[in-house]
Amino acid sequence: MNLLYALESVRTPFWDAVFSAVTHLGEETVFMVAAILIFWCVSKQEGYYLLLMGFFGTVVNQFLKLLFRIPRPWVRDPDFTIVESARAQATGYSFPSGHTQNAVATFGGIARSTRQPWVRWACVAVLLLVSFSRLYLGVHTPLDVGVSFAVAGVMVCLLYTSDAAD
């Protein structure tokens, strides 16, 4: 909670708005839209991969949430406050972070499959910003975000490694 309290102490309305917007890039609809666009415009196989990653990641994430049942930071510590605009979407359990897992799976998958360096760097920037936004907004702990990042990272590596072996 120390990191969350440190971030709480430096919040400003400007950064609240920025990270409230950035965090939406970790929603399920983003991986679905990205998968459809990639399917139509780039590669059917890559589109299928992205859709598979998103759906499998969502199932794994919800399973872990129900298994561990860890409450949100402000539930654990009533003195802690979150950015209010984030409260409406921060429902259910805290661990692991669904937004982080979606962002790493989606943008990590795109980064792993693209040949364009600028696309790769943009994807890495987005997945890092979404992950940080969950901490800044106060809706997840570093453990929630770190485990989600690792789970999605492993999924990206396994899926794209299995393809290389084919």
Predicted regions and their residues:
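Conserved small/polar residues in nucleotide/adenosyl-binding loops
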Residues: 160-166
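Short conserved micro-motifs on helix faces and helix-strand junctions that flank
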Residues: 40, 66, 95-96, 135, ...
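Alpha-helical and His/Cys-centered functional microenvironments
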Residues: 103, 138, 165
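Interfacial helix-loop-helix junctions of multi-pass membrane proteins
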Residues: 73-76, 129-153
